[in-house]
Each structure stands twice: as structure tokens, then as C-alpha cells.
A protein has these predicted regions:
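Active-site-adjacent beta->alpha loops and helix N-cap segments on the catalytic face
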Residues: 15, 34-54, 74-76, 99-118, ...
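Hydrophobic faces of well-ordered beta-strands that scaffold small-molecule active sites
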Residues: 5-9, 28-30, 58-62, 94-96, ...
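Glycine-enriched alpha-helix->loop->beta-strand junction motifs that scaffold or abut catalytic
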Residues: 21-28, 53-55, 90-93, 116-119, ...
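Structural motif corresponding to the early beta-alpha repeats
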Residues: 47-85
């Protein structure tokens, strides 16, 4: 039985998380520090998001800083504490990834962090795209009991990474491969059809002008790094709905094809159908 496609929104704020829920997103990944690739949000953000998200699952990125994924002992302890806080605040899942200097999955550190997760779902984030051997890394991640991998297929965008994404899906059915980076309503169906994936990660943000009336153009809070002081990026419900619409059409086509195949091959047992339904229920729990 074909799985229903799901969208995870990379929410850069609680406001974005709420808009993602309003648009029908299955899950949000709550992040701070988007220009750095996403860092751990604050206690207050996690708590408020948990209070407001009652229809959409809440995952929290655990990343103490931007940059690489080789973490110092102090950073490792910070990650451990942040995982415990996310769990205590009621997050449905956490998102993290750690590498060695040689570009391999840091299995001992990952196992230490996994021990703190409890019942939360776990996504190995785009540290995967920095692994020196993606297929070996995937086996290590599966061995850790992680639920899914967020990846662009080790390319600049998920669309460019379709060949590797497809290989990873075909390599094994024990873990969810979730394409992310550059995914939008214009390419999500193509990525879905060419890779066989059913979960997708994107931001769907639009820029909103600041409400500030007085603006001092001589000063920037980013110092020498130019950051738009008076624009705010927020999840755009219309972009989320457009992507969901594309996936809904794909899912309907898949169902029609499945029905046609069943009519041509009616020998599948009721027991096999029951097994398929159980698999779908397990996916919904993640």
C-alpha cells in the first residue's frame, strides 16, 4: 500500500510553526539561527510551540552552533542537556547529527545522545551531506535506531541530489529518507516520483516588512555581515498548501495505479493488506 506523503516545515520561529500548522503541515522542525543552517531554539520557543501545536508534530533541532559537525566535549554536554530539555517540554522528536574529523558518523557520541532521547523520534540532519561515504553512513545511522535522514543527496539542492536520494531509498527500506534543501511546490512532485520518497522538508518562507517606523540605516546588528534589519522571513501558508496540493495529486495517481494493479493481480491476501495497514500506522507514530 502506498504511503501518504508528508511535509515537514523548517520553522524559524514559533510564528512560522503556527502558520505551518494552519497550512496543514504534518510536522515542523523548530530552529533558530537559520542563516547558520539552524541552531537549537530557546527553552521559551520550544515551550510556546508545544502549547500551540496541537495538530502538527514538533521536532526540535539540537545544534549548539553553526559550522561543522565536529563537536567539542563542552558542546557535546550542551547537546545532551538540550535533548533532555526538549523531551521534558514535550517535543515529539529531535534532530541532530555528529561527525568525526574524517567525515564519518561519530557513532559513540551519537549513541550517547540517543540514550537521552527516550520515546522521541530522531532525525539525522544534513550532517549526512558532509559524510565521506554516504552509504556506509546510512548503515551506521540505521544501526543507531534513528527514524529518518534529512538530506539533499549530498548536492546543493535536493533536486540536483535525486540520483543519490534514489539510491539511498533503494538501498534499504529500514529508514525514512527525507529530501530537503531547495524543495518547493515547483519540484516536490518530481522529487517524489523520481526518488520514491514520501516525506519532504522545506521552509516555504516569504519576507514580511518590519513594522518599525524609525529606521537607522547606518547601523546593522550583524556587524560586517549584512543582514536585512527590517525584513522578517515567515512560513507562507500558501506555499505550504501549494506543495501539499502537488503531493495530493501524486498520491491520488499512486492510489489509482495501485487499484488498477490489484484488479489485474487480485491474488494478494487479506493478511498482506493488514500488514500494509500496520506499516502505515507505524509511520504515523514517527
Amino acid at each position: 500500500m502506498s504511503n501518504k506523503s508528508k511535509i515537514e516545515i523548517c520553522a524559524n520561529s514559533v510564528e512560522s510553526a503556527v502558520k505551518a500548522q494552519q497550512a496543514g503541515a504534518y510536522r515542523v522542525e523548530l530552529c533558530a539561527g537559520i542563516p547558520e543552517g539552524g541552531t537549537t531554539p530557546s527553552f521559551g520557543e520550544i515551550r510556546m510551540a508545544r502549547q500551540l501545536l496541537n495538530q502538527t508534530k514538533l521536532h526540535v533541532i539540537i545544534r549548539p552552533r553553526g559550522g561543522d559537525f565536529l563537536y567539542s566535549p563542552i558542546e557535546q554536554e550542551i547537546m545532551l542537556h538540550d535533548i533532555k530539555v526538549a523531551r521534558q517540554l514535550g517535543a515529539d522528536g529531535v534532530v541532530f547529527g555528529c561527525l568525526t574529523a574524517e567525515g564519518y558518523v561519530d557513532v559513540p557520541l551519537m549513541q550517547k545522545l540517543m540514550n537521552a532521547v527516550g520515546e522521541m523520534s530522531v532525525t539525522f540532519h544534513r550532517a549526512f551531506d558532509m559524510c565521506s561515504n554516504p552509504k556506509e553512513a546510512l548503515e551506521q545511522i540505521i544501526g543507531l535506531g534513528i527514524d529518518r535522514v534529512l538530506t539533499s543527496g549530498q548536492e546543493a539542492t535536493a533536486e540536483k541530489g535525486i540520483p543519490l536520494l534514489k539510491e539511498l531509498v533503494e538501498q534499504d527500506g529500514r529508514i525514512i529518507i527525507m529530501p530537503g534543501c531547495g524543495v518547493n511546490a515547483g519540484n516536490i512532485r518530481k522529487i517524489a516520483e523520481e526518488t520514491g520518497t514520501s516525506e519532504f522538508h522545506f521552509s516555504g518562507r516569504s519576507s514580511v516588512d518590519s513594522g518599525m517606523i524609525y529606521r537607522n540605516s547606518k547601523v546593522s546588528m550583524g556587524g560586517t555581515v549584512k543582514i536585512e534589519e527590517y525584513l522578517k522571513d515567515v512560513t507562507d501558508p500558501d506555499k505550504v498548501k501549494a506543495a501539499l496540493s502537488e503531493l495530493a495529486m501524486k498520491d491520488e495517481n499512486d492510489k489509482a495505479l495501485e487499484k488498477k494493479n490489484k484488479s489485474l493481480n487480485p491474488k494478494k491476501s487479506k493478511k498482506e493488506d493488514d500488514w500494509d495497514d500496520e506499516d502505515d500506522d507505524l509511520d504515523d507514530d514517527k
